[in-house]
Each structure stands twice: as C-alpha cells, then as structure tokens.
Amino acid sequence: FKVTLDTPDGKKSFECPGDSYILDKAEEEGLELPYSCRAGSCSSCAGKVLTGSIDQSDQAFLDDDQGGDGYCLTCVTYPTSDVTIKTHCESEL
C-alpha cells in the first residue's frame, strides 16, 4: 500500500506492506518520526488518519473516541489501503 505521511517537514510517501507497521517502514525509508515505547502503550507516535484505512488492533492506549476520531499509534498500525496520516499529533490527544 502507498503510505503518505503529512509531517511538519512536508509530505513523504513510501510503500508499506499490509503486514508491516507504518513506523517501522518509515524508519527503513529514513524518516525520523517521534516514538517512545514502540508497543502501542503510550502516545509519542500518535498520528491522525486523513484518508484510507488502517488496522491498529495491537494498540492499548487510545480510547474508542480517539480511535473513532481517526487517531492512531504509528508503531502498531498496519495499512489496509492506501493511506494518508498526519504525524506529530500527540499534543492533540
């Protein structure tokens, strides 16, 4: 799937298979994104899905309202379609 990250430095796109976490693939592509636990139990890597769909069933931090509003934790989020995610969203939670 094509993943586009809307970062403070501009938009960056890369291919990410449906079985790879978006944060891991972004790092392989040389992108520096915020993270801390890498286990879906904090909010350092939070992003917001602008278009497309994801699977973040491995996360345990965001509540249903935050997930329903489109927020995700990029360290435990898989793409399930082409997706655009705004990064650096921890302060919005």
Curated annotation (Swiss-Prot):
Its main location: plastid. Its cofactor is [2Fe-2S] cluster. One of its GO terms (cellular component) is chloroplast. The keyword Oxidoreductase does not apply. The keyword Signal does not apply. Keywords: 2Fe-2S, Chloroplast, Electron transport, Iron, Iron-sulfur, Metal-binding, Plastid, Transport. Binds 1 [2Fe-2S] cluster. It holds the Pfam family Fer2. GO terms for molecular function: 2 iron, 2 sulfur cluster binding; electron transfer activity; metal ion binding. [2Fe-2S] cluster binds at C37, C42, C45, C75. Residues 1-91 form the 2Fe-2S ferredoxin-type domain. NCBIfam families: fdx_plant. This is Ferredoxin. The lineage of its organism: Eukaryota, Sar, Alveolata, Dinophyceae, Peridiniales.
